[in-house]
């Protein structure tokens, strides 16, 4: 019986050592607690998917959300970034930040853009920063429209 408990403890310890730790820091305009919970729930789903392909055990993500596009443009100008007018969100790999330029009027669509941009960060983690565009955008589109 002791051997059984010893083996069980060893298995549990090994499982803990391989657990994903994801820290997300929020910047910009505040999100509601409900929005944060939804984002973190979907992010956990994304992490479980990407973990199958060698996602690092510890990740730090930065999400910056702006309610007004004008505020986002002023912020991005500091980094000499000038997005196209049709862009609602972007992932900037050199800053490792997902930036939402303006909140969508429709709640779910706005969250979808966030899921899309966070997916870019995770894809870059498993491909050493050089994914084919079709692969990067394909996964981001998939997660943008996922219902968890």
Please tell me what each predicted stretch does.
Residues 14, 51, 147-148:
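Proteins with a high burden of low-complexity, intrinsically disordered sequence enriched in S/T/G/P/A and R
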Residues 15-19:
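Sec/Tat signal peptide C-region and signal peptidase I cleavage site
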Residues 20-132:
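Juxtacatalytic substrate-recognition/specificity segment
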Residues 130-148:
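Post-HExxH zinc-binding segment in Zn-dependent metallohydrolases
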């Amino acid at each position: 019986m002791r051997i059984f408990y010893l083996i069980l403890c060893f298995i549990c310890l090994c499982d803990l050592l391989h657990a994903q730790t994801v820290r997300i820091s929020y910047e910009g305009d505040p999100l509601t607690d409900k929005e944060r919970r939804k984002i973190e729930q979907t992010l956990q789903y994304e992490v479980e998917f990407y973990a199958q392909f060698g996602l690092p055990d510890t990740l730090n993500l930065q999400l910056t959300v702006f309610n007004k596009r004008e505020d986002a443009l002023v912020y991005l100008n500091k980094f000499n970034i000038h997005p196209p007018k049709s862009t609602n969100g972007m992932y900037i790999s050199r800053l490792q930040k997902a930036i939402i330029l303006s909140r969508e009027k429709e709640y779910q669509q706005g969250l979808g853009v966030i899921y899309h941009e966070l997916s870019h960060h995770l894809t870059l983690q498993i491909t050493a920063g050089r994914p084919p565009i079709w692969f990067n955008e394909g996964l981001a589109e998939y997660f943008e429209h996922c219902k968890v």
